[in-house]
C-alpha cells in the first residue's frame, strides 16, 4: 500500500510543480522544501523507497544517445589534449621559423601560457553564457573560436603572431573544457557518472598521445610543426557538425521551463525509462531549480554568483571543486606536458619527442584504468593513495636531477645520450604521471557534480575551470624560469611539498559522493563537509544497490 501511494504521488508531483513554477514563487519554494525533505529522509535513513534513487538504480542505464553525447562532448577534451601535446614538441621543432631566431625560455613560456590566459577568460564567459543560451550553443561557439585561433597560428611568422593565435585558441579551449564535463555530469546516470566524465579525460590524454606521435613522425620534415598545428582544426569541425544535430541537457530545458523537451531528452538518454522515473527525475530537477531573482540575463548571472557564495552547501561545493582543480595544476603535471620535450632534450636524449611519448602513453593507459575503478573505489580513496605516490615520485626526480648536474640556464649537460640518472628521471616521471592519471587527473574533473542547484552549476563549473586555467597560466609562465633559478632539484622538491599539503586537503575535506544523485550533493554539504557521514552513506547505498540487484522482480 505504502509503495503504491508513493508511486501515485511521484506521478502527480511533476505536473503540480510545473503549475506552481508558472503561477507563483512561493509555491516553488514550498515544493522545493518538500523535495529537499524527501532527499534528507533518504540521506538520514538510507532508504530508497520514497525517492527516485531506487528507480535510478534499476532504470538509469546509459543509452546509446547518452554515449553519443558523451563522446561528442569529449571531443573538447581531445582538443585540449592535442593542444598540450603538440606545443611541447613544437617548442623544440620551431627552430628559427618565428622571427628568424631560436626561441628563448621566456618566449617559450609566453607562447605556452598564452593559451592558458585565453582559456581563463574563455571559462569566465562560458560559465555565464551556459545558463543564458545553453550548453550546446556555447560549445558550438567554442568550435568556431578554436578554428580561428588555429588559422592565426598557421599564418604566424613572428613570435607575437604565434602568441596571439594561441591566445585566441585558448578562448575556445577554456569554454570547451568547462562545458564538456558540465554536460556529461548533467546527462549521466549517477551510477555511471564518474566513468562517463573520465571519458572526457581519456580523450584529453588520447589527444596528447596522438599529438606526440604526429610530431615524432614530422621531426625530420621541414616546418613539420605547422602540419601538426593545422590538424588542430579537425576536432572542432567534427564536434560542430555532431552537436548541430544533438540536443542540450534536460536540466537546461528545465531551467527555461521547457519541461516537455526535458522529458523527451530524458527518454532518449535512458534505456526504456518508465513514466514514473521520468516524472520523478523532472520533479527533482524542478525542486533543485531555485528561482534566481533579477530582470536581465546579466543580473541573474550576478545573483547566481551571490547565491553560490552565500548558500553553505554551494560554497562548500565551490571550495572542493576549486580545490581539486588547484591541486591538479599546482602539483606540477602540466609543466611536464608542456615542457617534457624541452626537459628530455636538455638532460641529453637525442630524440626528446620520442621519449615524451612514453610519458603521454603512461597518462593515457592509467586514465583508462581509472575509468574501470573510479566509481567502484571512490574518488576519495583513490586520491588518498595517489597523492603520496606523486610526492614520492617527485622526490625521486629531484634526487636524480641533483646528480645529473644539469644547468637549464645554458642548456648544457654532462654527457649526451642515455645515462643512469637520466633513466631514473624517466622512471620517476612515469610513476608520477601514473599516480596523477589514476587520481587527481580524473577526480578534479568530476568536481562539477558537487553542485546540485542547477542555477549555480555552470557558475560553479566556471569557477573550477578558472582555477584550473589560472594554475595552468602560472605553471606555464614560470616553470622554465624556476628550472633556471632554483634548479630542477629545487623545482621538483617544491611540487613534492605541494603534493604533501594537498593530501591533507583531501583527507580532511573531501567526502565520498559516490552513489549520491546530482540533486542531493549540495543538500548533503549544507551543514558541513561530512566526510565520515559520506563514507557511511556510500556503504549503505552499495548495500541497497546489491540488494536491489539480487531481489527478484514481481
UniProtKB/Swiss-Prot annotation:
Compositional bias annotation for Low complexity: 15-34
Family statement drawn from the similarity comment of this UniProt entry: Belongs to the major facilitator superfamily. Sugar transporter (TC 2.A.1.1) family.
Compositionally biased tracts (Polar residues): 1-13, 44-57
Record's catalysed reaction(s): myo-inositol(out) + H(+)(out) = myo-inositol(in) + H(+)(in)
Source organism (scientific name): Candida albicans (strain SC5314 / ATCC MYA-2876)
PANTHER family tied to this protein: PROTON MYO-INOSITOL COTRANSPORTER
Compartment(s): Cell membrane
Transmembrane segments: 65-85, 110-130, 144-164, 167-187, 196-216, 227-247, 313-332, 354-374, 382-402, 420-440, 459-479, 490-510
Keywords: Cell membrane, Glycoprotein, Membrane, Transmembrane, Transmembrane helix, Transport
Gene: ITR1
Protein name: Myo-inositol transporter 1
An individual GO BP term: myo-inositol import across plasma membrane
Keyword Transmembrane helix set for record: yes
Amino acid at each position: 500500500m505504502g509503495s503504491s501511494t508513493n508511486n501515485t504521488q511521484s506521478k502527480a508531483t511533476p505536473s503540480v510543480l510545473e503549475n506552481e513554477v508558472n503561477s507563483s514563487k512561493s509555491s516553488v519554494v514550498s515544493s522545493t522544501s518538500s523535495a529537499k525533505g524527501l532527499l534528507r529522509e533518504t540521506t538520514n535513513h538510507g532508504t530508497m523507497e520514497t525517492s527516485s534513487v531506487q528507480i535510478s538504480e534499476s532504470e538509469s542505464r546509459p543509452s546509446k544517445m547518452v554515449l553519443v553525447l558523451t563522446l561528442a562532448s569529449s571531443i573538447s577534451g581531445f582538443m585540449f589534449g592535442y593542444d598540450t601535446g603538440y606545443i611541447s614538441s613544437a617548442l623544440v621543432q620551431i627552430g628559427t621559423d618565428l622571427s628568424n631566431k631560436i626561441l628563448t625560455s621566456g618566449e617559450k613560456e609566453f607562447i605556452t601560457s598564452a593559451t592558458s590566459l585565453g582559456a581563463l577568460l574563455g571559462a569566465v564567459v562560458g560559465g555565464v553564457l551556459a545558463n543564458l543560451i545553453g550548453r550546446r550553443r556555447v560549445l558550438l561557439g567554442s568550435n568556431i573560436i578554436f578554428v580561428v585561433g588555429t588559422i592565426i597560428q598557421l599564418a604566424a611568422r613572428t613570435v607575437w603572431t604565434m602568441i596571439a593565435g594561441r591566445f585566441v585558441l585558448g578562448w575556445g579551449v577554456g569554454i570547451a573544457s568547462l562545458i564538456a564535463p558540465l554536460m556529461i555530469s548533467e546527462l549521466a546516470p549517477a551510477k555511471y557518472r564518474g566513468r562517463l566524465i573520465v571519458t572526457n579525460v581519456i580523450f584529453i590524454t588520447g589527444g596528447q598521445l596522438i599529438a606526440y606521435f604526429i610530431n615524432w613522425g614530422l621531426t625530420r620534415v621541414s616546418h613539420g610543426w605547422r602540419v601538426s598545428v593545422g590538424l588542430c582544426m579537425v576536432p572542432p569541425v567534427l564536434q560542430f557538425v555532431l552537436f548541430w544535430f544533438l540536443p542540450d541537457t534536460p536540466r537546461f530545458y528545465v531551467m527555461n521551463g521547457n519541461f516537455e523537451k526535458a522529458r523527451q531528452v530524458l527518454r532518449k538518454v535512458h534505456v526504456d525509462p518508465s513514466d514514473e522515473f521520468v516524472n520523478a527525475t523532472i520533479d527533482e530537477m524542478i525542486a533543485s531549480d531555485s528561482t534566481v531573482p533579477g530582470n536581465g540575463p546579466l543580473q541573474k548571472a550576478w545573483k547566481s554568483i551571490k547565491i553560490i557564495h552565500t548558500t553553505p552547501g554551494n560554497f562548500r561545493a565551490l571550495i572542493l571543486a576549486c580545490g581539486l582543480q588547484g591541486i591538479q595544476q599546482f602539483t606540477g603535471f602540466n609543466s611536464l606536458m608542456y615542457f617534457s620535450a624541452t626537459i628530455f632534450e636538455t638532460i641529453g636524449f637525442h630524440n626528446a619527442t620520442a621519449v615524451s611519448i612514453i610519458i603521454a602513453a603512461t597518462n593515457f593507459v592509467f586514465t583508462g584504468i581509472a575509468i574501470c575503478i573510479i566509481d567502484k573505489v571512490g574518488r576519495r580513496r583513490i586520491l588518498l593513495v595517489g597523492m603520496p605516490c606523486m610526492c614520492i615520485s617527485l622526490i625521486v626526480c629531484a634526487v636524480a636531477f641533483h646528480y645529473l648536474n644539469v644547468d637549464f640556464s645554458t642548456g648544457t649537460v654532462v654527457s649526451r645520450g642515455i645515462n643512469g640518472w637520466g633513466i631514473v628521471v624517466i622512471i620517476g616521471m612515469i610513476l608520477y604521471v601514473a599516480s596523477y592519471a589514476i587520481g587527481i587527473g580524473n577526480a578534479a574533473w568530476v568536481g562539477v557534480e558537487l553542485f546540485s542547484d542547477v542555477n549555480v552549476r555552470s557558475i560553479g563549473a566556471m569557477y573550477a575551470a578558472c582555477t584550473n586555467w589560472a594554475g595552468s597560466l602560472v605553471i606555464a609562465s614560470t616553470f622554465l624560469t624556476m628550472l633556471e633559478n632554483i634548479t630542477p632539484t629545487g623545482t621538483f622538491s617544491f611540487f613534492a611539498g605541494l603534493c604533501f599539503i594537498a593530501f591533507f586537503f583531501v583527507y580532511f575535506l573531501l567526502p565520498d559522493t559516490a552513489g549520491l544523485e546530482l540533486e542531493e550533493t549540495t543538500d548533503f554539504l549544507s551543514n558541513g563537509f561530512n566526510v565520515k557521514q559520506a563514507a557511511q552513506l556510500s556503504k549503505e547505498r552499495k548495500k541497497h544497490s546489491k540488494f536491489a540487484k539480487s531481489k527478484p522482480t514481481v
